[in-house]
Regions:
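Conserved small/polar residues in nucleotide/adenosyl-binding loops
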Residues: 1-9, 170-175
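Aromatic- and glycine-enriched pocket-lining scaffold segments that form the walls
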Residues: 3, 8-43
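Tryptophan-centered motif/residue detector
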Residues: 10, 80-84, 165
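Long, repeat-rich segments with strong aromatic
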Residues: 36-151, 155, 159
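Eukaryotic acidic, Ser/Thr-rich intrinsically disordered low-complexity regions
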Residues: 160-172
């Protein structure tokens, strides 16, 4: 098996594994086992995530998609993993994960992806808060989710460049959330 892809845009192994795992929970237990093993191999030792994002036109957060996947894979062990993966998250750092992306031109097909980034980050932050309800990150994550939704939700219908696909992220990419 090859290595993971952590680049942004639509090439994101953690995002793909999250969706595949959600499907496999109902249809293919052996696939869940394989996905969990790969996720642990590829992401289990990640520490001190820098979160160098956004890059300008992606709609997925590589850092938060990874955290979302690991919340499902690790269960009760997720809190310990999260604390070393994003050790300053409770303090709102790295700031790039807590600050909604600014969309300068919603008619530009690439820049409009940043509304998608805000929506997918909101989904990830809400899921992380739900996975860690007693953790100090929970209220911080909920606030970040609300901020990201507020930045992009009102613009779902502003221009065709976003309208034709952004609603898919708003309705939640995963039936488990």
């Amino acid at each position: 098996v090859g290595s993971e892809m952590c680049i942004r845009d639509s090439y994101n192994t953690a995002f793909a594994l999250t969706l595949a795992r959600d499907w496999a929970l109902d249809h293919d237990p052996a696939l869940v086992t394989l996905i969990d093993a790969r996720a642990r191999d590829w992401f289990g030792e990640d520490r001190g995530c820098q979160a160098w994002e956004p890059g300008g036109d992606e709609f997925l957060s590589s850092a938060l998609c990874e955290a979302l996947l690991m919340s499902r894979v690790l269960g009760d062990g997720f809190a310990g993993w999260f604390d070393v993966f994003l050790p300053d998250a409770v303090a709102g750092r790295p700031q790039s994960l807590f600050t909604p992306a600014t969309v300068s031109d919603r008619s530009d097909g690439k820049i409009a992806h940043l509304d998608g980034l805000n929506l997918s980050r909101a989904w990830c932050w809400r899921s992380i808060a739900a996975a860690l309800p007693a953790h100090p990150i929970a209220p911080v994550a909920r606030e970040a989710a609300d901020d990201h939704l507020a930045a992009s939700l009102p613009h779902l219908a502003d221009d065709y460049m976003g309208t034709h696909w952004l609603c898919l992220l708003y309705t939640s990419p995963s039936p488990r959330d």
